From Swiss-Prot:
It comes from Shewanella halifaxensis (strain HAW-EB4). The keyword Magnesium applies. PANTHER family: DEOXYURIDINE 5'-TRIPHOSPHATE NUCLEOTIDOHYDROLASE. This is Deoxyuridine 5'-triphosphate nucleotidohydrolase. It comes from the Bacteria.
Amino acid sequence: MKTPIELKILDSRIGTEFPLPAYATPGSAGMDLRAITDTQLVIQPGETVLIPTGIAIHVADPSLAAIILPRSGLGHKHGIVLGNLVGLIDSDYQGPLMVSCWNRGSEPFTIEIGDRLAQLVFVPVVQAEFKLVDEFNQSDRGTGGFGHSGTK
């Protein structure tokens, strides 16, 4: 069963010239987000740009969130990654979805109108409540810190 998520079209080209975000296969975890711009964009090496997707969503359910993740081919082949690494969309956010693209490569990269830029994935959320303690129960891991457990 699929969970309904409210989606607002902010650009009339969505649903006509460009499809609504959708799962490509029954096993897909993410839906592609597209660059819905008025002109092509050229991202220079080292530059970060914020690109509209033409949609807004309202997750509404506090036990869910949406995350925006990079498309693997753009990062690996062209050095195009998300400027914020991962975009977190809280359940109560209702504004436009934007994709921050960073060119970490050495060549300018052109984004055409409608290019697929990133993936939108919905994930479960557990809201925690802190319990103050003076000491933790000891664990095998302890307080070794970053990299303490090694690679083997």
